[in-house]
């Protein structure tokens, strides 16, 4: 998911997506440990998506505090 797409979502929606991605990451790591994972690049992709979402949430927090 691109940053532009993430910015169009509300903060609550982003937090829901982060939760879903964390669950997916857990499952991917489990599959990796058991030797069932075919696409190992997906782990990296999910981690980066989570980081992007957290960054955008933090940017919004900083912007909100700056307005006060």
UniProtKB/Swiss-Prot annotation:
GO CC, any one term: cytosolic large ribosomal subunit
Keywords assigned by UniProt, alphabetized: Ribonucleoprotein, Ribosomal protein
Highest taxon of source: Bacteria
Protein name, entry field: Large ribosomal subunit protein uL29
One Pfam family of this chain: Ribosomal_L29
Statement: the UniProt record of this protein carries the keyword Cytoplasm: no
Cleaved signal peptide residues: none
Family: Belongs to the universal ribosomal protein uL29 family.
Gene3D superfamilies assigned to the protein according to its UniProt record, in alphabetical order: 1.10.287.310
UniProt xrefs under SUPFAM superfamilies: Ribosomal protein L29 (L29p)
One GO term of the biological process aspect: translation
Record InterPro entries: Ribosomal_protein_uL29, Ribosomal_uL29, Ribosomal_uL29_CS, Ribosomal_uL29_sf
Keyword NADP set for record: no
GO molecular function annotations of the record: structural constituent of ribosome
Species assigned in the record: Geobacillus sp. (strain WCH70)
